[in-house]
């Protein structure tokens, strides 16, 4: 198995899950959009999380998150750069389930955030992966990647910036959320690997398939959800060996 050079996050946090008590860092039971910037920073700096999932799909989030993180906590993020040491990963809208204008906004945000990060002295784009919820096919993963490339190239044609000229690709993390889709996750990922090889001439350096737990359990029950998750993990292990592509499932 080839070695992955890119750091792989081992712990992920997301915006204020249900808590029994008010958050210790703000002592409030309701976390506003304005508070979420500090929440992300606390997850990184105090709780030691490697990755923070920023929910562009299901929430109206602060779209200036990268700007505010770098400007408020400049020293920390220059020492622990986003996209290299710490990771902010957008969960973007699935255009097969909802309208695409929020995806367009997310992609423009990702691209322009790279401009900002480089201007602040960072050496890497702050966002290098996005999570695609409700993934059902390899075509959806590849289409999302290609759409980002189109947006990035259009932005470069209009607003030239040498620092981010090569930033025109982003990796997509497929979040598979239905039991029936998890049981055939090997087909989804294998089809994607073949598409990727055809498009780029080689296989991806690694993949981070995301296994949902709450939705499968809610829709199909606990036992089917657990069995489907185990099946998906087994599928990914076999695909990793078959194609020599490291798999790092998120669950």
Residue ranges and their predicted role:
Residues 62-74, 103-116, 141-154, 185-195, ...:
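Well-ordered, non-membrane alpha-helical segments in soluble/globular domains
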Residues 1-128, 134, 150-153:
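Alpha/beta catalytic barrel-like cores
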Residues 77-80, 114-122, 149-164, 193-202, ...:
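Alpha-helix termini
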Residues 106, 132, 136, 140, ...:
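Short, well-structured alpha-helical patches and their helix-loop capping segments
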Residues 2-14, 118, 186-251:
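Active-site capping/gating regions of soluble enzymes
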Residues 85-94, 119-136, 158-177, 200-223, ...:
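Core alpha/beta catalytic barrel or barrel-like domain that forms the active/cofactor pocket
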Residues 30-31, 54-67, 75-77, 136-138, ...:
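Aromatic-enriched hydrophobic runs in primary sequence
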Residues 98-99, 138-141, 180-184, 216-220:
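Short, well-ordered, mixed-charge alpha-helical segments that flank or form enzyme active sites
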